[in-house]
From Swiss-Prot:
The lineage of its organism: Bacteria, Pseudomonadati, Campylobacterota, Epsilonproteobacteria, Campylobacterales. Keywords: Disulfide bond, Electron transport, Redox-active center, Transport. It comes from the Bacteria. The gene is trxA. GO terms for biological process: cell redox homeostasis. This is Thioredoxin. InterPro entries: Thioredoxin, Thioredoxin-like_sf, Thioredoxin_CS, Thioredoxin_domain.
Length: 106
């Protein structure tokens, strides 16, 4: 089973600059984030080689969170070739996340 990519200020830009990525902004104390975590793990496995499934710990990456204006968590950013193209806030279904990823992978 594939694992998501943990993003930091150091690897964020280089990781998302090419292709499609889903970036989950989360925190360890966040109940809804914990509910979403297994879905993120499943997507990382299902989309291996097609899209990057990533997570940003907002407690550890405050500057990165501020850069993207993250005010509520979980916040999910969908990127294509380094540009944010869609954003969802709150717990989402796996179906909704797959739908958005598949649209971007087109």
């Amino acid at each position: 089973m594939s694992h998501y990519i943990e993003l930091t200020e150091e690897n964020f830009e280089s990781t998302i600059k090419k292709g499609v990525a889903l970036v989950d902004f989360w925190a360890p104390w966040c109940g809804p984030c914990k509910m979403l975590s297994p879905v993120i793990d499943e997507l990382a496995s299902e989309y291996e080689g097609k899209a990057k499934i990533c997570k940003v710990n907002t407690d550890e990456q405050e500057e990165l969170s501020a850069k993207f204006g993250i005010r509520s968590i979980p916040t999910l950013l969908f990127t294509k070739d380094g540009e944010v193209v869609h954003q969802l806030v709150g717990v989402q279904t796996k179906v909704a996340l797959k739908e958005q990823l598949n649209k971007l992978l087109g």
